[in-house]
């Protein structure tokens, strides 16, 4: 939350009001300097000096991106400046005919208008009509553009992860798909199913049935030995292009698989996985994109009735110790670390037209990061990740 001009230039309201204030102040100080000091109200010098201090304070607060923390203080300070400028205007107009005094009065009128705008904005509730109108230009218009350096970059990184790993986890005869329902809440941009294994055809019900009993020659659970009691493990990779050598495979065709009570059920080892499956086992690498899977600790065997080719979900009914949670970023390997905690000052309902926004309630504690703009990347306690408006939350000391 350090000083950065990007925080100031990224807010059109800040640029317009501070720039207008500086120009108005220059007009006022020029008129005061050119006036005859015998007829110029001496107290107006203090009002003009006080005004430039207020303008500089507001600029610094915007540049440090903590303007929301001092809004109530600014209302009091700007109200004092409003009294000074309006009083100076009255004295300069009616008590003197000096051109310099009239020029200073014009500058004070402009400063009075600016101070009134600041009082209405800083003193108004974020959901008030005036604030909503002003924020429609700054927060909605400019704030979402900052996602290019924050949340949208995160989406782009996830897209790259999808491309590099091919995001495939075939469940049947080599062609599997993963639908929108299998993605984390932050990845709703995928509106249509994605062909995972690179094929062009979706698996048929017959291929899924054959795959579940390991009778497809090119499927991941194919039985190439002719022994119905032995299911060959996968020889390809789920997410990458490198094949893995099975470590728990029994190549003796006279032996049977002992990892499952069902002899017709294939098995796979952790060496065949790339992290997209999010097993709870610590031996499985977590370099995927954080897909939520219904998997168990003891996942060496798969139930032959639990293959769902439409969604890519895997169930294991032999073990009830399941993990059905949205994984943290440290587990998914996305590289995102939420370094700060923030408390919601108000309740917020996400815009239904923006899939990146998240809703939250007043006093809710959020984990936030990328706090350099009007919109911060945030994660709720339930694991939902998205963006939230910075003026609705307050950073907490940790």
Curated annotation (Swiss-Prot):
Residues 337-398 form the SH3 domain. Residues 34-42, 87-101 are extracellular. InterPro entries: SH3-like_dom_sf, SH3_domain, Sho1_SH3. Forms homooligomers. It is a multi-pass membrane protein. This is High osmolarity signaling protein SHO1. It comes from Candida dubliniensis (strain CD36 / ATCC MYA-646 / CBS 7987 / NCPF 3949 / NRRL Y-17841). The lineage of its organism: Eukaryota, Fungi, Dikarya, Ascomycota, Saccharomycotina. Plasma membrane osmosensor that activates the high osmolarity glycerol (HOG) MAPK signaling pathway in response to high osmolarity. Keywords: Cell membrane, Membrane, SH3 domain, Stress response, Transmembrane, Transmembrane helix. Residues 156-167, 242-265, 297-326 have a biased composition (Low complexity).
């Amino acid at each position: 939350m350090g000083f950065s001009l990007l925080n100031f230039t990224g807010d059109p309201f800040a640029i317009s009001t501070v720039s207008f204030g500086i120009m108005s102040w220059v007009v006022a100080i020029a008129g005061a300097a050119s006036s005859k000091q015998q007829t110029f109200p001496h107290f107006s010098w203090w009002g003009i000096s006080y005004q430039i201090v207020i303008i500089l304070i507001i600029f610094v607060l915007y540049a440090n991106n903590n303007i929301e923390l001092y809004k109530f203080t600014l209302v009091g300070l700007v109200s004092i400046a409003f009294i000074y400028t309006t009083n100076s205007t009255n004295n300069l107009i009616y008590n003197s005919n000096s051109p310099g005094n009239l020029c200073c009065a014009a500058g004070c009128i402009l400063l009075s208008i600016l101070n009134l705008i600041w009082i209405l904005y800083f003193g108004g509730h974020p959901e008030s009509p005036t604030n909503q109108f002003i924020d429609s230009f700054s927060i909605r218009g400019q704030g979402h553009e900052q996602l290019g350096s924050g949340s949208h970059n995160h989406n782009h990184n996830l897209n790259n992860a999808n491309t590099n790993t091919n995001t495939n986890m075939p469940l049947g005869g080599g062609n599997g798909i993963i639908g929108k329902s299998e993605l984390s809440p932050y990845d709703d941009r995928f509106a249509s199913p994605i062909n995972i294994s690179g094929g062009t055809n979706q698996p048929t019900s017959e291929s899924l049935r054959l795959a579940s009993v390991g009778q497809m020659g090119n499927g991941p659970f194919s039985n190439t030995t002719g022994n119905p009691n032995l299911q060959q493990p996968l020889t390809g990779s789920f997410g990458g292009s490198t094949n893995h050598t099975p470590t728990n495979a029994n190549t003796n065709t006279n032996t049977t698989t002992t990892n499952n009570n069902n002899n017709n059920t294939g098995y796979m080892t952790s060496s065949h996985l790339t992290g997209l499956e999010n097993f709870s086992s610590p031996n499985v690498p977590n370099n995927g994109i954080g897909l939520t899977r219904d998997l168990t600790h003891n996942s060496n065997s798969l139930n032959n009735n639990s293959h769902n080719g439409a969604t890519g979900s895997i169930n294991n009914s032999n073990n009830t110790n399941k993990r059905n949670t949205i994984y943290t970023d440290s587990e998914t390997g996305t590289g995102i670390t939420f370094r700060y905690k923030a408390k919601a000052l108000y309740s917020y309902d996400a815009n239904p037209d923006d899939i990146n926004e998240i809703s939250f309630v007043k006093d809710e504690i959020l984990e936030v990061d990328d706090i350099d703009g009007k919109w911060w990347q945030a994660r709720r306690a339930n694991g939902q990740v998205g963006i939230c408006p910075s003026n609705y939350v307050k950073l907490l000391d940790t």
